[in-house]
Amino acid sequence: MEWPINKPIYDINKSWEDNLENGPFIEGYKKVDRNDNKDPSKYIDFLGQKLASPIGVPAGPLLNSQWVKFALEAGFDLPTYKTIRSHEHFGHPVPNVMYLDLESEDKQFTKSDSGSTLHATQTIPTTMDQLAITNSFGMPSMGKEYLYKDIALAHSYLGSGQSMIVSITGTASSAHDFLQDFVDTVRIACDAGAKMVEVNYSCPNVVTGEGQIYHNPDAVYEISSTLVKELSSKNIPLIIKVGVMDDLEKMERLFQQAERAGVAAIAGINTLSMKVTDKITGEPSLGASRLTSGVCGAPIRSAALDWVSTASSIIKKQNSKLKLLGCGGIVKPEHFDDFLNSGADIAMSATGLMWDPYIAMKWHNNNKNN
């Protein structure tokens, strides 16, 4: 159960479609018994769902029901079904994931590093502390009929003390169509039996005039309040996914507007957006049209923890009822505790799961509090 056993369960040399159809790639994986199965009376309550633990997977790596099934069996009690759209959408071509060349093994970025330049490398890291990747998928999505069946199938795999979030986003060419598309997408999630919905505000969008929606608290309010109206009659809570913010006042306003809209929880961070280029040529590593991409893995943990701590402070300051989901850089089991101790109600790992599918079980079986 130590690095490296096998290649990541997501094959970075294959397309997103290939990984969806044939993954996760778990040859050599040995299922581990979980030693912390609790009495249901001791489950934690999160947005009305009873969970055996606060350990989850954020939107991204769980491409369909088979990926969700694997995460559930691997000890993640709150997986997120990857971001869906209202219609089939093809993502970017391979490469979608590349390793990054860091200055040192313990390199940690801060939020002020967003937008800086890094270089891709073919060198495979040899420890989880060295695990740094960039990813650019374009948020691909399967079509409506597939999603109805597959999200329902994913729900059928839930065991006692487990639940699932369905992540959504909007797609359109005008502000009005954009809002309606969010509604159309959330209806797919609801019709498929979603217990919780997360709306992704942390990926680029040109319609609002902002690089990312979460930087515009008023746009967040408008979209979120519309979605809450759709969800409230079905008693489905809304979570919003955001990223790092340099402006504390704007972050405080974001939280105010989110709660005012009826949002139940805020998740962060997604990735750190950086420029990734070839060290020799200076050309974009992922292709000419993708100069900027998301950085994930070990080196964003500091920025993510900073976000969680700040978010927790804002919630206390505002006497808010918002819950927090923290993610970013959790690549070792003890990192879950770092996030929980910093104020997160739920701690989530994506890159950590992909490269170490035992990470959640290590936490369960080694955690003295369980």
Curated annotation (Swiss-Prot):
Broadest EC class assigned to this enzyme: oxidoreductase
GO BP term (any one): 'de novo' UMP biosynthetic process
Cofactors (names): FMN
Gene Ontology MF annotations: dihydroorotate dehydrogenase activity
EC number(s) on file: 1.3.-.-
Annotated residues for binding of substrate: K82, N135, S136, F137, G138, M139, N200, N270, T271
Active site: C203 (nucleophile)
Entry keywords, A to Z: Flavoprotein, FMN, Oxidoreductase, Pyrimidine biosynthesis
Catalyzed reaction equations: (S)-dihydroorotate + A = orotate + AH2
Binding site for FMN: K82, T83, N200, K241, I269, G297, G328, G329, A350, T351
InterPro entries: Aldolase_TIM, DHO_dehydrogenase, Dihydroorotate_DH_cat
GO cellular component labels: cytoplasm
Pathway: Pyrimidine metabolism; UMP biosynthesis via de novo pathway
Cofactor annotation remark: Binds 1 FMN per subunit.
Family under the similarity heading: Belongs to the dihydroorotate dehydrogenase family.
Biological function: Catalyzes the conversion of dihydroorotate to orotate. Participates in the pyrimidine biosynthetic pathway.
Protein's name in the database: Dihydroorotate dehydrogenase
Organism annotation: Dictyostelium discoideum (Social amoeba)
